[in-house]
Regions:
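PLP-dependent amino-acid enzyme catalytic core
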Residues: 1-394
């Protein structure tokens, strides 16, 4: 199947109200202030892909590469670990009756309290890795649920961080519900990146963590003198990352915010279908996609509160487009610099490339020779064996 695009009829120009209850500037700045102090923090690269821009018939393509984030391979390193830190901070505060700094948790000052906490989450791979890292860094137990389609390599990477990994049959959405049930045990807490069930506070912390990536990208563009992008193509999934990008850009720039296009696999299109229906709606496909990190059938309710009026366009792409983008990025002659991107990592770029080739899509998305497009390379080769199978060595 070819790509599909739909315009969100509920989209509102400017800065719609209600964003602050989900992703606020105050929360974003708190996350940026905290995460930037962590050992291993470094601003990830922003690459200017001039050959890709030329091939797409636009002015610039900027690729924010999250493969090196905290050594965990994806932007998710910013969300789950931060949410674990914030949750433990609240638990210690409840016991001591005073606010404690996250740096105290990292030093192990309150290990007698935190070691009694078990955090649990479901994952397609990357979020669970971040939650497991946060548990290791800040001193609690971690249980991660993976579904049938999560590769052994991704599950092993989570176990290597000290988490207990439980493999279930069924889909990602089934594992989300199972994690919510487990979290009802005494001493257990859910750290989810979707709010279909469970602790909204942790889900909000996850999205605030993601804004660190967005703020870095805007700062890098400002320093490069290229200015604000005209468009941002973001990955879909349950919507958490897309909502963080949407809210942060709309709050900063209002009616001058970039046009946002959310990109999903054609067989895992819950956000696309929700935009058509005007309400959270299940994906129509069977969720079988090479883009494992985007294999989600149900929308995050919290994320949808931002996206339902904040994002103008939603699109779906076939697996073939994602693999083509991986191969293009790996070929320095075609991309301008060699970049290693996982199956979901280049999905935003894949959406841009597909749309740029179609005159009707270009017109609908207002893509032209003056367009400056930002995309997020959300993951590196988090399953190296699969990457090598999909991207032939050159």
């Amino acid at each position: 199947m070819a790509f599909r695009i739909t315009r969100n009829r509920a989209w509102s120009h400017g800065a719609p109200g209600g964003f602050d209850a989900v992703v606020s500037l105050q929360g974003a700045r708190a996350a940026q202030s905290e995460i930037s102090t962590w050992p291993g923090y470094a601003v990830t690269p922003l690459y200017h892909l001039a050959p890709v821009a030329s091939a797409c018939g636009i002015d610039h393509v900027f690729y924010k590469d999250e493969a090196s984030r905290f050594g965990l391979g994806s932007f998710k390193a910013l969300g789950g670990a931060y949410a674990v830190a914030r949750l433990l901070q609240r638990r210690v505060q409840d016991r001591l009756g005073r606010l404690v700094a996250i740096s105290e948790l990292a030093r192990g000052d309150h290990r007698a309290i935190t070691q009694c906490v078990t955090v649990v989450s479901a994952t397609d791979g990357n979020h669970g890795r971040s939650v497991a890292a946060g548990a290791a860094w800040f001193g609690c137990r971690c249980v991660i649920l993976v579904h049938a389609d999560v590769s052994d390599r991704r599950a092993e990477a989570i176990e290597a961080l000290g988490a207990d990994v439980i493999r279930l049959t069924g889909t990602y959405d089934d594992s989300v519900r199972a994690a919510a049930r487990l979290s009802r045990q005494p001493g257990w807490s859910l750290v989810a990146d979707t709010s279909t069930a469970g602790d909204e506070e942790a889900c909000i912390d996850v999205m605030h963590g993601y804004t660190v990536m967005v703020a870095e990208a805007f700062d890098q563009l400002s320093q490069s003198l290229h200015g604000l992008p005209t468009h941002i193509f973001t990955q879909g999934g349950v919507g958490g990352m897309a909502a963080a990008v949407c809210a942060h850009s709309r709050q900063l720039f209002g009616e001058h915010a970039p046009i946002q296009v959310v990109v999903e696999p054609e067989r895992a299109d819950c956000l696309f279908q929700s935009a058509i229906a005007g309400a959270p709606t299940r994906a129509t496909g069977d969720l079988k996609t090479i883009m494992a990190g985007l294999s989600c059938g149900e929308v995050s309710q919290l994320a949808w509160r931002v996206l339902e009026r904040g994002t103008e366009f939603f699109m779906t792409i076939p697996d073939r487009a994602a693999v083509d983008a991986m191969r293009l990025l790996a070929d320095a002659a075609r991309s301008g610099t060699r970049i290693i991107a996982g199956e979901s990592g280049g999905a935003g770029l894949a959406g841009l490339i597909e749309a740029s080739r179609d005159p009707d899509a270009r017109a609908e998305l207002r893509l032209d020779r003056e367009s400056r497009v930002l995309v997020f390379g959300t993951e590196g080769a988090t399953d190296p064996v699969l990457y090598d199978a999909l991207v032939p060595a050159r």
